Amino acid sequence: MTMTGGHHHDAHHEDFQLKDTNPLLGEQWPKGAAGPARPAVGGGIAGWLGLEKPSSTYDLVEQMFFLYVRVVKAKDLPPNPITGSPMDPYVEVKLGNYKGTTKHYDRRANPEWDQVFAFSKSRVQSNVLEVYLKDKEMLGRDDYVGRVVFDLAEVPTRVPPDSPLAPQWYRLEERRVGGGGDGGGLKVRGELMLAVWIGTQADEAFPEAWHSDAATVRGEGVASVRSKAYVSPKLWYLRVNVIEAQDVQPQARGRAPEVFVKAQVGNQILKTSVVAAPTLNPRWNEDLVFVVAEPFEEQLLLTVEDRVTPRKDDLLGRAALPLALFEKRLDHRPFVQSRWFDLEKFGIGGAIEGETRRELRFASRVHVRACLEGAYHVMDESTMYISDTRPTARQLWKPPVGVLEVGILGAAGLQPMKNRDGRGTTDAYCVAKYGQKWVRTRTMLGTFSPTWNEQYTWEVFDPCTVITIGVFDNNHLGNGNGNGNNAGGGGGGSPPARDARVGKIRIRLSTLETDRVYTHAYPLIVLQPSGVKKMGELRLAVRFTCLSLMNMVHLYTQPLLPRMHYLHPFTVTQLDALRYQAMGIVAARLGRAEPPLRREVVEYMLDVESHMWSMRRSKANFFRAVSLFSGAAAAARWFADVCHWKNVATTALVHVLLLILVWYPELILPTVFLYMFMIGLWNYRRRPRHPPHMDTKMSWAEAVHPDELDEEFDTFPTSRQQDVVYMRYDRLRSVAGRIQTVVGDMATQGERLQSLLGWRDPRATCLFVVFCLVAAVVLYVTPFRVVALVAGLYLLRHPRFRSRLPAVPSNFFRRLPSRADSML
């Protein structure tokens, strides 16, 4: 949507602001509190909150209570009464209207499940828990075998760090005639090992449990709704220094080969320059750098090729080298030993056997120096939002300086992301990424105000880093198809479903005060082809705890990245290419986890498209620069007013200050630093109280033109109509022309400065040289204080003594030549 509406603009912008929240954090165990289904007198589920418990480490989330049921195994089950063979048992756990079932086993008398069910207290409408054992193959009749009944008022409470509750054996009983729910039926053959307790989301069983909130999810979708933690693969830079090759034999005799080496690791391909080899021993001495991940599954494939024509390359030999062959370098000093590798022949030589094949195989070889660089930090995210700066090798890591704790409380006001059963809905989950650790909350189904209340912790090795938290809509809920309940799925020929972006936020740790809990609702803002849109709010509780203040302060004096990035830096082009290769590896590895963290999620969190051209971003960056220099411009205007005596009192005070500084020059630097100290103290009262958040106004998202938005969302290469592309190209040429003019003017001024002593204009240079000689003599015989005083008084002279024409130095400088005259 385009930002219009006049007086509604301020209210609309206010909707994008950060909001304070006051959640009730930490564990709450009020004595004698009742659940929603507590009877009027005794019984019921009052026992859920009838005990006072000590607080645990989950103090940044609102306490949530669950009834946990662990179904471990069964024994001594009766056979099928019809066939006489062992039954196909499964267990059904029923609490009110909620039912959860284990998988069934074929013909098993002593099955083992070890499955946990979790029922949310807020949705329980019963005071009795029933656990049924059933036979799946008893068709056409009641498959009921036996049950175990629990009164919720008698269920014990358990919260970490308490030890896990030990499961017990329970005899199965018959269902009482009349449907009574309080147990007491006749005992039947068979026993179930169960553990039933009241716990919170801090329980160890919480992440892997079946949740009543996701009772409608079946099959493969069950795994995709659970909370999970992931670890990024350990990435290394593989540096391959291709030195030379020996005895390279071209396939076509009588010509000097033009040889290059192509190196490939996985889908990464790099080539050396093409070198003419009249002596058949070409030399390159070029570095090729790749990104590889542990465990090293790929090989380094080196191929030597001959550039016959611009479109034809002949393969002369190859060598396949396992990555484990190369040593790991942890510093810039150790010398890596180079090695010769034999090249295996291709073409005709590849089909020859015996001695001839061995001769061909060892006829050519390549000289390589390769190592795995462990002293670099492998970039897999945008450098502006980096979350980790540690080198690859663990031996080089410093101790952590702090701990970051994030409580993901919930969201509010989410927008419908798809249609299900004829109405809009959202199945939201959160992903948080900091350092090598990724976390994913459970999916809350069919709600626009999901409540997660999950807390996660990260070690902090550098406070000048950023945590990224994103919200996504889960489109992989199973139900027998690949796209779950995604409304855009379509037929069988539709592309695979993708988890839709709801929005994300970033928090820079250095902007947080230590040991303070920040509880805010962050706006989830996304830019769509129709304009900027608020997708809801994400409620977080964040705390940054300092472990060592001295180490943290010391970090501010250290380089942001490891030493190798400065001793042996990569080029900007190399870093960009390596970053995208690292992103691809991380996305591929996390996509192979179970449940997978999907590629579209990883790419959105890592800002894979942050380099793409955007007129909106260009405008935003331009106005950021304008805002940056606005203070200097204001100071220049104030000084011009002082020089022109706009305010006589101010000009008089400046004269007094000039006299003091001229006669006491030793006060200049102390005055400057004391002034900055006082400004810092004055600004302390107005220091930012909240973490920064997405600013739609600064991002130029509220006033962006619809066509510029459409261009930003265009594919690469473009997929728009030809006339639209022509129009955008002309617009880009217009913008680039203005930039070209500004850059040319800057170059002209610099070249005029160079020409002062360059004798390109002999008269101007002669005048300047004579002026320098006179100035040297005058400044030598005149005290510095007198010179400074005269210069200051001349600069502050009254307008009566000023001319409206440009000054003599300006006239002289503008007449100097530049190289603009030599441009075509």
From Swiss-Prot:
The cross-references to InterPro entries, in alphabetical order and at most eight, read: C2_dom (IPR000008), C2_domain_sf (IPR035892), C2B_MCTP_PRT_plant (IPR047257), C2C_MCTP_PRT_plant (IPR047258), C2D_MCTP_PRT_plant (IPR047255), MCTP_C (IPR013583), QUIRKY-like (IPR047259)
- Specify whether Ribonucleoprotein is a keyword of the entry: no
What job does the chain carry out?
Involved in the export of the long day-specific flower-promoting signal (florigen) RFT1 from the phloem companion cells to sieve elements. Promotes flowering under long days through the transport of RFT1 from the leaves to the shoot apical meristem (SAM).
Which proteins does it associate with, and in what oligomeric form? Interacts with RFT1 and PI4KG4.
Provide a GO CC annotation, any one: endoplasmic reticulum membrane
A Gene Ontology biological process term: flower development
- Organism of provenance: Oryza sativa subsp. japonica
Query: Transmembrane residues, as ranges?
Result: 625-645, 657-677, 764-784
* Primary subcellular site in the record, as a coarse category: endoplasmic reticulum
* Source organism, top-level taxon: Eukaryota
Known tissue expression:
Specifically expressed in the phloem including companion cells.
Q: Which CDD domains match?
A: C2B_MCTP_PRT_plant, C2C_MCTP_PRT_plant, C2D_MCTP_PRT_plant
Give the protein's recorded name: FT-interacting protein 1
Q: Where is the signal peptide?
A: none
Cited Gene3D superfamilies: C2 domain (2.60.40.150)
Q: Which gene encodes it?
A: FTIP1
Question: What membrane topology was assigned to this protein in its record?
Answer: Multi-pass membrane protein
Keywords, A to Z, come to: Endoplasmic reticulum, Flowering, Membrane, Repeat, Transmembrane, Transmembrane helix
Q: Where in the cell is it found?
A: Endoplasmic reticulum membrane
Q: Which family does it belong to?
A: Belongs to the MCTP family.
- Phenotype upon gene inactivation: Delayed flowering phenotype under long day conditions.
